[in-house]
């Protein structure tokens, strides 16, 4: 009896998840759909652990979100305009709660993706306040890179910002960009930018510009999708926040894939693009922070973080007004 009691106590303390390694690289759209569903099923199965099952409504909510996202994947595979509307409606139902959480949406300068736990005093480890203070006060820089074609040089600002509006046909090849709105993509290091560009250092040149958020730029409202298995497990003592992370993690799973082929149909971007449509149409959120899908694992944080910001104005000065930019 005592042995069974000890086992039960251990089970009740086991509010950790395992077996979810992100990002994921696959070879085809079909493999993306299949692998995503497998990972969602694996994640949902872990909600049957006693520690999670005893939390009122948590397991049911997470399993429902996983089921909705599996349906969204089927709709993405169909790919018609009617499916896009359905995807947006279903996805919105899974994410709307996260929009109203300070950890989920915050100013750029207070976002976990860029400042870690430093802005969240209630999550601090005792005795490390000096470290958190330095993290909060450190100016951070963002970067953008481009690979030139043979004989091409980049020396002007407009050559280093978002894709021009006359390149709308290419927007489907960008993770968060939509037909109507391009996105400005930035990274926390020049290294992650080079990975995103698929830069071959032996054969190609690389131009990099630094984008330093100014006072207004630091106030941009950012959706944080930098949510990892390690972070969730590290929040085991913070039940409410861990519950929110568990509910958003299925979305992080299905948006953390990279398909290694040249197909124009990029199904792994479908849900990311839907999320950006929701943000643009229904919220005052101004960008999305996420881990690069070109990295090897979640240990790339914080050096492998990307930021996607939708561009609403064709005017170059307005679209870059939130940054002090160092030319390439």
Which residue stretches match the model-derived regions?
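Short, small-residue-biased leader/transition segments that mark boundaries at the very start
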Residues: 1-8
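A short, exposed loop/beta-hairpin motif centered on an aromatic-Gly-Thr core
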Residues: 181-186
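Active-site and NAD+-binding cores of ADP-ribose-processing enzymes
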Residues: 9-136, 144-149, 155-167, 173-176, ...
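Short active-site loop/helix that positions an aromatic residue
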Residues: 190-202
